[in-house]
UniProtKB/Swiss-Prot annotation:
InterPro entries: Prot_translocase_SecE_dom_sf, Translocase_Sec61-g, Translocase_SecE/Sec61-g. The lineage of its organism: Archaea, Methanobacteriati, Methanobacteriota, Methanomada group, Methanococci. It is a single-pass membrane protein. This is Protein translocase subunit SecE. Its main location: membrane. It is found in: Cell membrane. It comes from Methanococcus maripaludis (strain DSM 14266 / JCM 13030 / NBRC 101832 / S2 / LL). The keyword Amino-acid biosynthesis does not apply. Belongs to the SecE/SEC61-gamma family. The gene is secE. One of its GO terms (biological process) is protein targeting.
Amino acid sequence: MQKSKLNTTLNGLKDFLHQCRRVLMISRKPTRQEYITISKVTGLGICLLGFVGFVIHVPITYLKALIKP
């Protein structure tokens, strides 16, 4: 029973490593233009999240000031 469980685990690990190898074989380094585009999108996302946090923070701070003088 233990041997079959070990074989199953080893086969799963072997399949995972095979899939990782396949991904690494087809992946490539991004071009400069792709890198710049990814950086812009990431920066825009960070700014958007910061803005949403600010929009949530300001009313809460204002309401706290009204409740506790």
